[in-house]
Amino acid sequence: MNKKSYMKIGILLMVGLFICAGCSAQQGGKYTVEDLDNLAEIKIYSAENNELIKTISDEEQLYQYNQCSLYDDSDTEEHQHKLEKDLEGAKEQYYMISYKYPVARFGGEELVENTTITLYEDKNIIKMTVSGESIKGFSVPEEFLVFYYEVSEEEMNFYHSLVEW
């Protein structure tokens, strides 16, 4: 494998860690910042006019959002290109931008953009763009921060329910 493939695999692993929350939270209880993997809020925008539709900060919804399993270790560079090609001409429907609490305990308390998930009309493929500012310590070229995933109908219904909740 070449250096490019190793970098993509490394970033996919990091993204998996960003998205997956620990299983230690108990249902019905209050979630800690760690349970939510530092996720603070999600803003949902219409892709048609970039209008803010909704801001989600409810802990239960944030926890469920974190539980969506986007990472598929069978994804290869070729599969990513196939999914990207499958989206050609597809109409973007919503942007879901997730924000996390800053890692530093001191200093700015401004939320940090983490990922943007793009939903498409009549497609079970989503595009996830990792924000460059969410990766500390080194710069990653933008082309390595965009991932495509086929999601189940159940997961797609969940994403759409966030818009309607």
PLM region descriptions:
Residues 13-17:
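Residue-level signal for mature regions of secreted extracellular proteins and peptides
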Residues 19-22:
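C-terminal motif of bacterial Sec signal peptides marking the signal peptidase cleavage site
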